[in-house]
Amino acid sequence: MRATLATLAVLALATAVQSDSRARIVCYFSNWAVYRPGVGRYGIEDIPVEKCTHIIYSFIGVTEGNSEVLIIDPELDVDKNGFRNFTSLRSSHPSVKFMVAVGGWAEGSSKYSHMVAQKSTRMSFIRSVVSFLKKYDFDGLDLDWEYPGAADRGGSFSDKDKFLYLVQELRRAFIRVGKGWELTAAVPLANFRLMEGYHVPELCQELDAIHVMSYDLRGNWAGFADVHSPLYKRPHDQWAYEKLNVNDGLHLWEEKGCPSNKLVVGIPFYGRSFTLSAGNNNYGLGTFINKEAGGGDPAPYTNATGFWAYYEICTEVDKDDSGWTKKWDEQGKCPYAYKGTQWVGYEDPRSVEIKMNWIKQKGYLGAMTWAIDMDDFQGLCGEKNPLIKILHKHMSSYTVPPPHTENTTPTPEWARPPSTPSDPSEGDPIPTTTTAKPASTTKTTVKTTTTTTAKPPQSVIDEENDINVRPEPKPEPQPEPEVEVPPTENEVDGSEICNSDQDYIPDKKHCDKYWRCVNGEAMQFSCQHGTVFNVELNVCDWPSNATRRECQQP
């Protein structure tokens, strides 16, 4: 069994390395687009599947009480077979990945902060996710928590560590299922958000791809009119906005330790609109706005203040005798337009073309769009789907190069997360069958480094009882019993480990080892050679920093 699993791990790694050279075209699909009126209505049948490598159904959520999957629109997604109709597209497009996103701006952050706070609620969520993906035949999960550690959104200081734990535990669960599910995340590029909530090197190692939301970098909240996805810094960018552009934002992810071939660059298929201050005749970038208006006037199909889909912009701005004046941001490489008190900054074929060439120059993994349903899919301004066609033209013929590692700033010791266990091929095999598991002292030893994640067993649960289609709380799922693993040479009470409120428990005999409860099972992890487990900080540290006197000597 050990040899078989080791072989599978090697094959999986070889497959991943091979697939990394293929650029990604990630298309987010907002399921509520079906409710837009008239020509704005967008259904699953309108998705240009052949233009995407990954399509992500948006969104599912998390329940308030038991931290399980929440189906936000059960009538559309379940009763009308939205999920199944979406994943059934695979039959005619077998090379495309059909994933689902959890989160989104409207979901807030407090529920997610609560979910990751305790290992029990994380496990509840993970079991629910596994059941959900199996039931509706998705190819993976995209994490769109906006944002870990964001106090202004109901987050907690501990979210940064706990989000990483969630990602690691999801990865282990997905590997154990053995269906090749992908795990990705949509992330911000503002430095303060990364500092608050993201262990960048570790997340980039665990996730298949990082979808950088390189848009909404300006908006009505800023107090001035501007394009919201500028490629480069402009002369008027000051203070917090000086580095808030696509080029500097992606560089920041690299600088913090993320390989370039894990980064997917976000391209908005929509614009941000503004209402200018009364009597303001200055229509340039950074001009004064009426902030109390909340943004520009709603457009006819998306019907949201301060927000226009690309097809709503092109039908208005590019129309003959429309009265709109169209301009170009020379440094930011984006168009903007104005008429009267209305001002909108957006992306068009010219700006998207520039960004595609820039992605290839930088060696990034590909491009993603929020959202595919806001392209000119009806051909109201000319050909259908002009923006996604540009993404496909460039990315389908582009081979992603190996990552470049220069200019990476080492993570300070105090900011590093606790050590993570190694690949299972280096330690005991993951059980792949289920038999009775005793309730007392199951223990496992895993040889580890501080950079790679182990894949412990994940309980299989009853699909029907583990997914909430409405916010009412459901009974806690009952996991099936797992294989008993022989105890290790270092006897520890497994029930003591798993009943503890602590995520990390130092080994009583060995200074360089510690224990964690993973999916109800006590697992032992080892620090790198020459380091010991720091009980106070829950990290592997130099012996001189050890809080246990007996561990202060190497």
Swiss-Prot record:
The residues covered by the GH18 domain are 23-398
UniProt keyword terms in alphabetical order: Carbohydrate metabolism, Chitin degradation, Chitin-binding, Disulfide bond, Glycoprotein, Glycosidase, Hydrolase, Polysaccharide degradation, Secreted, Signal
Tell me a Gene Ontology molecular-function term this record carries. Answer: chitin binding
Where in the sequence is the signal peptide annotated? 1-19
- Disulfide bonds, paired cysteine numbers: 27-52, 527-540
Residue ranges of the Chitin-binding type-2 domain? Answer: 495-553
Q: In which tissues is it expressed?
A: Epidermis and gut.
The biased composition feature labelled Low complexity covers 431-457
Q: Does the keyword Glycoprotein apply?
A: yes
Q: Which GO biological-process labels does this protein carry?
A: chitin catabolic process; polysaccharide catabolic process
Task: Kindly state one GO CC term assigned in the UniProt record.
Answer: extracellular region
**Keyword Chloroplast attributed:** no
Enzyme active site: 146
Protein's cellular compartments? Secreted
Composition skew (Basic and acidic residues), residue ranges: 467-477
Spell out the reaction equation it catalyses.
Answer: Random endo-hydrolysis of N-acetyl-beta-D-glucosaminide (1->4)-beta-linkages in chitin and chitodextrins
Quote the EC number: 3.2.1.14
Which residues does the annotation say bind chitin? 76-77, 103-106, 147, 213-216, 370
The UniProt entry, under InterPro entries, shows: Chitin-bd_dom, Chitin-bd_dom_sf, Chitinase_II/V-like_cat, Chitinase_insertion_sf, Glyco_hydro18_cat, Glyco_hydro_18_chit_AS, Glycoside_hydrolase_SF, Glycosyl_Hydrlase_18
Checking SUPFAM superfamilies in the record gives: (Trans)glycosidases, Chitinase insertion domain, Invertebrate chitin-binding proteins
Relate the protein's function as given in its record: Digests chitin in the exoskeleton during the molting process.
Q: What is this protein called?
A: Endochitinase
* Annotated source species: Manduca sexta
